[in-house]
Amino acid sequence: MPIKVKVKGEELQEVSEHFAKLASPSFNDVLNFSIESQSLEEGTLKLDLRDELIGNPIFRVLHGGVISSILDIAGAHAVYLYIFKQVMGKPIEKKMERLGRISTIDLRIDYIRPGKGQHFTATSNILRVGSKIAVSRMELHNEDNVLIAVGTGTYTVG
């Protein structure tokens, strides 16, 4: 299932659609998340609980692997937004070359509490971007704004 993009603004729409195209078809399609970032400063992804994403069927909580995956994607999305700002106005070939380099090289996830809920929001922002790597911070909350997990991701950018 293709990744849905629900954003406002022409630039944000362009970068989010490009990110969605790069991320599909792949494992990301299994998660069936939507990109709902409201600015080029923070990545926001939404994910709904489905049976195939449950880790513990007795308590119906989100699987830990799903949590780490959505946080990793959110972190990469924040980096993608940041790099997109740097290459705005450049030819598409230059954009693709720079944006295509983004890849996870390290990921740390802290599970704060079980992934209870029906709707989840992953947010991410940039901690640092250098010439070779970028670091982002991510959080996952449920629909009641309960913090489920936090993460820090390191990504190649150069």
Predicted stretch roles:
Residues 1-158:
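Terminal targeting signals and extreme-terminal segments of soluble enzymes
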